[in-house]
Amino acid sequence: MNDEGVAVTPPLLSREQCQEIIDTFEEPGLFRSTVVMQRHQFGRGTYKYYADPAAVPLVQTLRERLYPAMAWMANRWAPQLGERTFPGTLDELIDECADNGQKRPTPLILQYGKGDYACLHQDIYGDIVFPLQIAIMLNQPGQDFTGGENVFVEQRPRFQSRAMVVRPQLGQGMVFPVRHRPILGKNGFRRHPMRHGTNAVESGHRNTLGLIFHNAR
C-alpha cells in the first residue's frame, strides 16, 4: 500500500464461496438499488447495492473481519494525510455514518459481460469517508473471462498521471484508497488523488464484490 497505493490479498474466498455471492445477483429482494451503468455515463455493465449486508452472511462476515486491519492502515495514514482517525470496529463506524445521515449500505456486486467496462471514479457517498476499500474477484481471469483488468490512476502534482493495471486471481481482494494516498515529498507528506476503473471485458463474464466500509446518504 505504501509503495504502490494498491495491495493484492491472499485468497479470501474459495470458488464455491465466490459462486455463492455471484448467485445473489439474481435475487432482487437482497438489493436496495440497481445501476445500469450506461444510463449514467459510468461505463457499461450493471451493479447492485445490497439492502442489508447482514442478509448475506458471507458478505457481512467479510466486512466485519476485514475492517479492523483496514482501520489500522487508515489510522497509520491519517496524520500523513492530515485527516481524522477511525474507530476500531465496523459497528462504531456505521453508527457514526448514521448520525451523519449516511444510512444506506454500500457493499455491492458488479457484473460485466463482453464489452462492459467501468470509467475511472471514486466511491465517496457522503461527508464521512473511510479511506480504504476492497474489491474481491469472483471469477478466474483467463478461464471465466478475458480482458477486464483493474485500472488505477494516480494523479501526481506537477507530473503526468501514473496508471497501474492489477490482475487479482479468483477469491483475491484488492485494497486501494477511496480518494487519495500519502506520498512523502521534500516538504513532508502530500496527497496523491487516485481513481479506479475496469478495462473492457473481451469475453465471458466478470463479477466483483465491492466492500466500501462507510455508508451512503
Residue ranges and their predicted role:
Residues 78-83, 140-146:
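Proline-centered turn/helix-capping motifs that create local helix->coil transitions or kinks
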Residues 107-109, 134-136, 209-213:
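A structural signal for short, well-ordered beta-strand segments
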Residues 102-114:
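A short glycine-rich, His/Asp/Glu-containing loop-to-beta-strand
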Residues 52-64, 95, 114-117, 130-131, ...:
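Generic detector of contiguous secondary-structure segments
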Residues 1-93:
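Non-heme Fe(II)/2-oxoglutarate
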